[in-house]
């Protein structure tokens, strides 16, 4: 980055960098615009009980990111995922609702007017108070925003009604740890697991699931899942220690429609464009964030990315802002970088 600016910030024409005091992993964009700009939440990744969530304010006109110190708060263990409530969630207060996963699913109200963060609920479905199976991820249903699904190392997916703070249903989803979950429709979600499968579930028929993909090598874990919100026929997944992004069409199970193989090391994160059905971004250990445009048919030599961005070190996290679709956020080491696309 060519010039530095105040507030732990450096910027160029197309990127803004925020330097955190600690390594970062979880990250989320708010769909609400506040008086100070667009809010971004980032979570620390410290091998310790005491971790933090910081709320940042991003002004795209002035290309500045500022921490909001009054809205920084402690979090038990590193949050495995952060999400702000979808815009479809109607709430009486003007504050933002933020969800985090780790030991439990937690809901927080971020109120910038009063500079407060209020813990709203801690949701735990464990029958024994001494034990909790860590949550690896969760997804907020934007069609039915009272519904939030979590996944855990104990092979289950749990669907919560967050308005009533009760479990709607809990399913044994896989044979091994469940690593990620994504909603497609109001009652349909999918998950990926260390057992190497992508499975789709319908809450109207809980006894059955559809396996739409399995790792080519048995038991190669699948780490992440992204469902294309602009075209629900397509989803993407990544395999452990693999440089591939696998694109699936749920109408033709088992065979990927495309495999994106231009990363030089393992892929860690994927995100579909919020405003286009054809674009997806991936980030990996090769320090690169690649944006792909998916053609109808891949050529004989595969698909090349339409744009390449190099970060300072391995990219651990990536989010594409739905409220500002010109911006992608990536996290690497102790930095959160916003890229204009």
Curated annotation (Swiss-Prot):
It holds the Pfam family WD40. WD repeats lie at residues 74-118, 130-170, 173-211, 262-302. GO terms for biological process: cell fate commitment; epidermal cell fate specification; regulation of protein localization; response to auxin; response to ethylene; trichome differentiation. It is found in: Cytoplasm. Roots, leaves, stems, meristems, flowers and flower buds. The modification N-acetylmethionine is found at residue 1. InterPro entries: DCAF7-like (IPR045159), WD40/YVTN_repeat-like_dom_sf (IPR015943), WD40_repeat_CS (IPR019775), WD40_repeat_dom_sf (IPR036322), WD40_rpt (IPR001680). Keywords: Acetylation, Cytoplasm, Developmental protein, Repeat, WD repeat. It comes from the Eukaryota. GO terms for cellular component: cytoplasm; nucleus. Changing residue 282 to F: In ttg1-9; glabra and loss of seed pigmentation. PROSITE patterns: WD_REPEATS_1, WD_REPEATS_2, WD_REPEATS_REGION. GO terms for molecular function: DNA binding. Interacts directly with GL3 and BHLH2. Part of a complex made of GL1, GL3 or BHLH2, and TTG1. Interacts with CCT8. PANTHER family: WD REPEAT CONTAINING PROTEIN. May regulate MYC transcription factors. Involved in epidermal cell fate specification such as trichome and root hair development, seed mucilage production, and anthocyanin biosynthesis by acting at the dihydroflavonol-4-reductase (DFR) step. Together with GL1 and GL3, promotes trichome formation. Activates the transcription of GL2. This is Protein TRANSPARENT TESTA GLABRA 1. It comes from Arabidopsis thaliana (Mouse-ear cress).
């Amino acid at each position: 980055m060519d010039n530095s600016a105040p507030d732990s910030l450096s910027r160029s024409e197309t990127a803004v960098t925020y330097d955190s005091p600690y390594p970062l992993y979880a990250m989320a964009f708010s769909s609400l615009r506040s008086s100070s700009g667009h809010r971004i939440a980032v979570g620390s990744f410290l091998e310790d009980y005491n971790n933090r969530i910081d709320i940042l304010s991003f002004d795209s006109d002035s290309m500045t990111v500022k921490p909001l110190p009054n809205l920084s708060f402690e979090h038990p263990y590193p949050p495995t995922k952060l999400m702000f409530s979808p815009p479809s969630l109607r709430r009486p207060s003007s504050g933002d609702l933020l969800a985090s996963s780790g030991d439990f699913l937690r809901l927080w109200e971020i109120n910038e007017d009063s500079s407060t963060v209020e813990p709203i609920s801690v949701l735990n479905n464990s029958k024994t108070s001494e034990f909790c199976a860590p949550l690896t991820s969760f997804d907020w249903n934007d069609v039915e925003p009272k519904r939030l699904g979590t996944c855990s190392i104990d092979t289950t997916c749990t669907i919560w009604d967050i308005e009533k703070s009760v479990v709607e249903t809990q399913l044994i989803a896989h044979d091994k740890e469940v690593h990620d979950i994504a909603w497609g429709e109001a009652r349909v979600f999918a998950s990926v697991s260390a057992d190497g499968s992508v499975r789709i579930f319908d809450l109207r028929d809980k006894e059955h699931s559809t396996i739409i993909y399995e790792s080519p090598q048995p038991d190669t874990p699948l780490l992440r899942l992204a469902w294309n919100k602009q075209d629900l026929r397509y989803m993407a997944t990544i395999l452990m220690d693999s440089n591939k992004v696998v694109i699936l069409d749920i109408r033709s199970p088992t065979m990927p429609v495309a495999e994106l193989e231009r990363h030089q090391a393992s892929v860690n994160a994927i995100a579909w464009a919020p405003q286009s059905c054809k674009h997806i971004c991936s980030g990996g250990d090769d320090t690169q964030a690649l944006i792909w445009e998916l053609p109808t048919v891949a050529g004989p030599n595969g698909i090349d990315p339409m744009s390449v961005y190099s970060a300072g070190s391995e990219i651990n996290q990536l989010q594409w802002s739905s409220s500002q679709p010109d911006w992608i956020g990536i996290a690497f080491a102790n930095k959160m970088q916003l890229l204009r696309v």
